[in-house]
Amino acid sequence: MADDLVDGLTRAGLPGAKASARYVRVSPTKARRVVDLVRGRSVGEALDILRFAPQAASEDVYKVVASAAANAENNHSLDPATLWVGEVYVDEGPTLKRIRPRAQGRAYRIRKRTSHITVVVESREPVSAAGRGAKTTRRAR
């Protein structure tokens, strides 16, 4: 995935910033469900989606997206209105293994999974409302 940003530039060559949360006590598969909601969206829209998402992992992802936006604003002097969620991914962290006692001397293994959540925001020019829905007409031959 993405290593570190080189001179404040993302992989796509756009200015941006990175934030990550490591060893978060949420399953990577559940965190990926939430991360997929915000990939490629503007930071403001992503934060709105995460604020009202019913999944428990949305709170952790919200904090990382907000931190990446703050890093871009404070460390690289980027305008928050032009920030987009460029790269966002969840890696698997170490699994905590616990034991649950069961009947007749048995024991079940409980696996408490952890995640590393990484968000890279990049500064793009905002798409105007007129440019988004404009259609080109074909000339008659």
Curated annotation (Swiss-Prot):
Keywords from the UniProt entry: Ribonucleoprotein, Ribosomal protein, RNA-binding, rRNA-binding
Keyword Membrane: no
InterPro entries, per database record: Ribosomal_uL22 (IPR001063), Ribosomal_uL22_bac/chlpt-type (IPR005727), Ribosomal_uL22_bac/org-type (IPR047867), Ribosomal_uL22_CS (IPR018260), Ribosomal_uL22_sf (IPR036394)
Family of the protein in this entry: Belongs to the universal ribosomal protein uL22 family.
CDD domains reported for this sequence: Ribosomal_L22 (cd00336)
Function: This protein binds specifically to 23S rRNA; its binding is stimulated by other ribosomal proteins, e.g. L4, L17, and L20. It is important during the early stages of 50S assembly. It makes multiple contacts with different domains of the 23S rRNA in the assembled 50S subunit and ribosome.
UniProt gene name: rplV
A Pfam family assignment: Ribosomal_L22
Descriptive protein name: Large ribosomal subunit protein uL22
Listed NCBIfam families: rplV_bact
MF GO annotations: rRNA binding; structural constituent of ribosome
A biological process term (GO) from this entry: translation
Superkingdom field: Bacteria
Gene source species: Frankia casuarinae (strain DSM 45818 / CECT 9043 / HFP020203 / CcI3)
UniProt key word Ribonucleoprotein: yes
GO CC terms in record: cytosolic large ribosomal subunit
Database matches in SUPFAM superfamilies: Ribosomal protein L22
Oligomer status and interactors: Part of the 50S ribosomal subunit.
